[in-house]
């Protein structure tokens, strides 16, 4: 009986399958036609982002160095890494998210996405901040398995 050769496949490396980030467009709950482009960051990316915002200070009482997170810098870096854009953020929606005076604008017009606008919204609108953080933290939002 002739011998059949069985080809041995090289094992697949998980590292070759992993992707550090993925951006998807997600509907913002409660606001018709408003979508936010969010980027999922792998744990390694989040750790790298956090490390950028750490500084070491000397504690005179304990005589030990202590790491301190610069929260403002972290918010800037987090927004840059996670919020990639939005569409349909009407001025009337802003009134439900934070205290604003939009009387000079058509309530149906939209606030354009800018890095500064994203940071201010994250800093001052706790509902938006909470939603972004929870949505980005849920891997299913980025895998299509929901």
Q: Where do the PLM segments sit?
A:
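Short, surface-exposed, charged amphipathic helix/loop patches that serve as local interaction elements
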Residues: 2-3, 28, 32-146
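Short, intrinsically disordered N-terminal pre-domain segments
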Residues: 1-20
């Amino acid at each position: 009986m002739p011998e059949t050769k069985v080809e041995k496949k090289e094992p697949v490396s998980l590292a070759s399958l992993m992707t550090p980030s993925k951006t998807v467009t997600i509907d913002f709950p409660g606001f018709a036609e408003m979508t936010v482009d969010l980027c999922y960051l792998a744990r390694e990316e989040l750790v790298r982002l956090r490390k950028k915002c750490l500084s070491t200070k000397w504690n005179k009482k304990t005589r030990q160095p202590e790491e301190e997170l610069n929260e403002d810098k972290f918010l800037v870096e987090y927004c840059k890494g996670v919020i990639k854009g939005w569409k349909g953020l009407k001025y009337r929606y802003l009134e439900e998210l934070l205290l604003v005076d939009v009387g000079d604008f058509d309530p149906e017009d939209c606030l354009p996405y800018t890095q500064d606008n994203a940071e201010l919204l994250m800093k001052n609108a706790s509902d938006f901040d909470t939603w972004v953080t929870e949505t980005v933290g849920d891997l299913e939002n980025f895998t299509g398995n929901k």
